Structure formats: C-alpha cells, structure tokens
Amino acid sequence: MDKNRRRGIERLCDEQIVPGTEVILLDDAFQHRYVKPGINILLVDYHRLICDDKLLPAGRLREPKEGKDRANIVIVTKCPEDIKPMGFRVISKALKLYPYQKLFFSTLKYSRLIPLFEEGEYPLDELLPHKHVLLLTGIASPEQMKMDLEHYETDITPLSFGDHHYFSAKDVA
C-alpha cells in the first residue's frame, strides 16, 4: 500500500490495479482523517477495553477515548468462548456506545498447524506435549496466542515482530 493512505487509495483507483474493486479495507486507519470512510469499524481487546486504557505512552490509545464515537461498528475481540450473557451486558454498558453503533463480540479460533519440515496440516488439539514450536508473529499483541499454546505443554520459541512488520528473508534466517 502506501504510508499515505489517501494517496494509496487514489493510486489503487486511478491505476485500476485490481479492476472492479468496490471495497477497500484498511487496517489501523481509524485515526487517518484524510480518508473519508464509508464505515468505521473499531476493534477493542476484551482484555484491555478502551474505557480502561490510556493514551500513549501510558497506554495503547493513539487518540482520546472519545474517538470511539466515530465508529459505526465496535467489535470486542479475543473474548473467552464461555463468556456469559451478563458479561456481554457489562462490557456493553462500560463502552457507553450510542444507538447508531452496533456491538459485536468475537473469539479466537486458530486454523490448522502447518509443519515447517514435513507435508500436511493438523488441528491444534493434536499438538503433542513437549513438541517444539516456533511461534512467529507480526501482530500487535502476541501474548494471548503464546498463552494459548502453552496450554498444550509445548516447548515454544517466540519470534515476535511488531504489528505490520515487513518480513525479509533475514528476519527468519
């Protein structure tokens, strides 16, 4: 893409890079005011709700909490699978959303494991205890994924890169 989101979108449209494109979905574009979105979707971590967070550098917020009012949709991510209806209501009340804002909840569901040095795939629940796993991530908060894998008593070597890291061969060599 382009660090200048507006220019990147204009280039996509002008050059017809993907003919027939009707939707452009941007990650981490909530605070980019030069782009006029058709819909704003805000992702909020279940373990660190926006109402409990602080602005950088004390917290993870890039703008004041009130910025959430621009969101059309709020998705609370990384919810436990066994969350009760009361938990949904408590979070809904804490977020103080407006009637025009839709609230959704999501949970993590991992795909199948793909071994590096052999063919095939297998489900996470078939991960053998004491099997060595290289956990390569390029996401903002890999801690939950690491904790989920530790549940399987697996030997984990984390190799974590920042969110949106541009991987090179040197990174994984």
Q: Where are each of the predicted segments found?
A:
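Short, flexible loop segments at the rims of nucleotide/cofactor-binding pockets, characterized by
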Residues: 1, 49-56, 111-116, 161-165
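Phosphate/Mg2+-binding loops and adjacent switch elements
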Residues: 1-99
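A short, well-structured juxtamembrane/interface segment
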Residues: 4-11, 120-123, 171-172
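Short, well-ordered secondary-structure micro-motifs
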Residues: 12, 36, 53, 86-87, ...
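Short hydrophobic/aromatic-enriched beta-strand-loop microsegments
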Residues: 22-24, 42-44, 103, 154-161
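G-domain G4 guanine-recognition motif of GTPases
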Residues: 47, 73-86, 106-112, 136-141, ...
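Beta-strand->loop->alpha-helix junctions that form or flank phosphate-binding loops
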Residues: 94-96, 101-109, 158-162
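Redox- and metal-dependent alpha/beta enzyme cores, enriched for Fe-S-associated oxidoreductases
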Residues: 118, 128-169
